[in-house]
Amino acid sequence: MAGGRPAGSAIEMEGAMRTLPSSGRPSGTGWQSRGPLFGRNYGLSPGSRLLPPRCQENADPQKMAFLLRKQWTLYSVSPLYKFSSADLKDYARMLGVFIAAEKQKGLAVDVDGELGIKVAMSGLPELRGSEQDPAAVLVQLSLRSSVSPKNSEEKLIWSGWFCCVAGDDLLENLPENFTCLPLFLVNGAESYTAIVGSWFQKTFDCCFRRLAISPLNLTWMAAMWTGCKVDKNTAATELLFSVPHLPQPLDISYAIHPEDAKALWDTVQKTPGEITQEEVDVFMECLYSHFHRHFKIHLSATKLVKVSTGIASAHCDGIIKFLQSQYLIGVLMLLTELAISQIQ
């Protein structure tokens, strides 16, 4: 199947061909929802989840726009000890001193000697699923001139933000003096991420881990995001598969027209607003069968590595891109769940 293609090549196929695959839903009662709404049994595959369209009516448009259409690398973070959102300015100053000290030791990123790094921390109270969730925290690093810092332009070079959206179960059992912000998203150089993470670990006795996304959770994302209402001009739903056991890497890109994907989902979904494991499985099986019918390739023998929709895109390596602000809370709910399952 590689056909002599160079390493890292990809086969792009328009899977839907404007022909809607049938749902093929199994009859009987063998398929049941196995868990509470939105999978509160952390660490287990939930029976059902919910992706609510949550418009950010009171959100700062500039801050929301800043989060969109960027590649964010995902981390899970254990609870922070004696962290206070009231002290963000002090934390920013302390982190700035720490970065300067690391730079003097040769551990920080090597930058122009005429430049210094400015640290800013601010709250993002809009990014909460409930009043019980702590406000998200945004950390930004900017370069500024040390010759005339007052008049110089600052260049944003790194951003990271901590959040907890609908982390009710963990919050209920959280010990005193701990703050739960289990999801950390980063855009910028890994060297800055390492330094910022080191300071947080030393200051708040927490632990960071890269957060990967399993193929199973990618199928959930494909189904959940397909079920959301978006503009007609949205991009195609695209699934990227990696073919294993080949001498050279090979990816298969499966693109489905968004209207066809939504129409298929509507034939699969039983309860509006709620998505079950059964429905995810049936949805993916329909897509796989349709693809095999046209291209004679069994996608079930490959590995799903990336999902792209009009709502967001996600890669198995733990890379996410948000595309719709009105669904940002819903996407963060799922990512928070995955982060909590990793730290428990």
Curated annotation (Swiss-Prot):
This is Centromere protein L. Belongs to the CENP-L/IML3 family. Component of the CENPA-HI complex, a centromeric complex involved in assembly of kinetochore proteins, mitotic progression and chromosome segregation. It comes from Gallus gallus (Chicken). Pfam families: CENP-L. Component of the CENPA-HI complex, at least composed of CENPH, CENPI, CENPK, CENPL, CENPM, CENPO and CENPP. Its main location: nucleus. Residues 20-32 have a biased composition (Polar residues). It is found in: Nucleus; Chromosome, Centromere. GO terms for cellular component: inner kinetochore; nucleus. Transmembrane segments: none annotated. Residues 1-32 are annotated as: Disordered. InterPro entries: CENP-L. Keywords: Centromere, Chromosome, Nucleus. The keyword Nucleus applies.
